[in-house]
Amino acid sequence: MKLTYSLFDPTGNRTILVQTPVPEAEQPRIAAKLMELEPETEQVGFYQETDPIRLRMAGGEFCGNATMSAAVLSAEHANAEALDAVISVSGAADPVPASVKKQPEGYWIGTVEMPKPKAVTEVLLPGAGAVPVVQFDGIAHVILEQPLPRPLAERSAPAWCEKLGADAVGLLFLDKRTGGLTPLVYVPAAGTLCWEKSCASGTTAVGYYLAREQGEPVTATLRQPGGVLKIAADPDGHLMLTGAVRQLETKTIDI
């Protein structure tokens, strides 16, 4: 089959959005093949320009960076310099509002009204002790203020995902002093375990956790391996994520 897809760079979190319709059962296989062809890619989503726009990640998880990228793709299709969109995204119970605006340098600034987490709990996890877990519909994020050796973190992610009963899990290594955040994301349905350059839902989880911890609204700028994401959060779950997106190229291949 011929497949058309676009490559995006949202804060280093290299993302493929497939524009050709693909049956849901085939999406993990197609995603795995595309990630072989584009080895710097960290995730794959399947895009439909309907009303609202639909975005399904290969593992059925939620992804804020891919949501922002989908808004950029829709703006490019409309030949628009700015766009306010509502996007139906896997792993989110309700459609997600997103806005993007093109910058003179060619990249886009985007904001996404992130879904409110279902819960924040403290969970006893092997190798980490009692740690906060921020649970979204499509992913659970574990906030870790103490480092773990990378091999241990990579072994722990699948076990913790199973223990939490989550569709996907993020291990968020947070340095409160510097604002540094290093995310490791495991998505079993897609068969991926990735040290991501940035993680939008992980950034949101940290913002919400800090707002609840401090009992007041916070604005956090989190420095990640691929760049900076900004989250404005309050304890009631109003969560606005801001980041940058570059559209790299669009390809059509036989697969």
Give a label for each model feature.
Residues M1-W108, V142-I255:
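A glycine-rich beta-to-alpha transition motif near the start of alpha/beta enzyme domains, typified by
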Residues V112-R155:
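Surface-exposed beta-loop interaction hotspot
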